[in-house]
Amino acid sequence: MELRVLAGAEQEQTYYVWSQAFERGDREMRQWKEWGEKIKEQTFTVGVFDAAGLQATVLVMNTRVHLGPEVIVAMGAVGGVACLPATRGKGYAGAALKGALEQMRAQGIWTSMLFPFSWEYYRRFGWEWIGTQRRCVLPTNILRSDPETEHVRAATPADRAAILACYTQFAGQYRGMLARDEVAWNDILDHSKKEYTYTYLYERDGDLEGYLTFRGGKEEETWIREFISRTPRAQRALLGLLRRHEMQVNKFRWNAPDDDPLWSQFYHWDIEVKIMPATMGRVVDVPGALQAWKPARSAQGTVHLAVQDECAPWNSRTWRVEFEDGKVEVRPTDAPPHVRMDIQALSQAYFGTPTVEALRAADRLTVEDETGYTALRALFAGPMMWINDDF
């Protein structure tokens, strides 16, 4: 078995593997190739070879995520995890994932996320579920009119900057929201070759307070790609707009963060809300990730944190973590640990959901010193986790 980052013509070989794994043998792989061309400057693919050639792949896209209002960190978005059937069960995909972790660390990518085909499989390699979200389904015939809807209008290309600013302000309320680049925004807001994209804005006093956008859909149910409201009146206004679609759409569906105020705006027996995990996340490099984080400026303390990480051995040791005035310093220590946790639990604490308190209640960490535990709580206090993208 040989593992390496693919280069040049080797990249074409990935489509054979991905087609078998994801597209039932499609030879064109048109959408994959078009998307790959758009993001090629920010991705790398780790391949595993044996005597028969390329057998397994992991693709990593170097992107960035918000961690509250002040911090944006590099994040390795993992996808394209695939292995040809004849060599499954031999550890090839796992080797590719470990190789991807090494490459991310070498490139200064301290965190990672992925959307799993199996939660348990990726947990073996250090990723863990992070964040919860609500999937909302609302029938249009139960929605109410609202006078604020008179301040809603269709977006134009000139509104792009205001939409991005609205999203950025909203994203700063959470840990995990993508700091989207132009490619991502084009994919969300531009028309596709087949369908128009409809984007509507709520604006008051020259300030864009919310927007929603969708493309395509069916009469029975239409998926709203993004429904963001920074104020309660913006949410009421946009819900009122959805009511005006009653003749075209029976139900609208969208994802929202777990603190979404929908139920304070409107509730009805026919509203369906499903609670689910948001995604899986991982700390790739403990000192790099922790020093990129900014705790509250009023918080200060020291914790000796023992981390266990079987797939990234550079993380497995005890770290002295000191923080004050919004800055974190991390260095190895031989002192007895205050708190012990595996990389999965640390990753959850880092992204904010579940909280340190919830992890302790679930026996996901071991406390040896209460003062150190109190410092750990203060270190990771802050916004909850949410992401409204996939990859």
Language-model segments: residues:
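Intrinsically disordered, low-complexity, positively biased terminal segments
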Residues: 1-7, 11-12, 16, 20, ...
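N-terminal, Lys/Arg-enriched amphipathic/low-complexity engagement segments
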Residues: 14, 21-47, 55-79
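A short helix-loop-beta-strand connector motif used in the catalytic cores of GNAT acetyltransferases and
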Residues: 36-56, 77, 187-201, 299-301
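Conserved beta-strand in the GNAT
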Residues: 47, 53-63, 75-77, 82, ...
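A short, polar/charged loop-to-alpha-helix boundary motif
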Residues: 64-72, 138, 218-226
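Conserved acetyl-CoA pyrophosphate-binding loop and the N-cap/start of the following alpha-helix
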Residues: 87-99, 233-237
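Conserved active-site alpha-helix within GNAT-family acetyltransferase domains
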Residues: 106-110, 115-134, 259-275
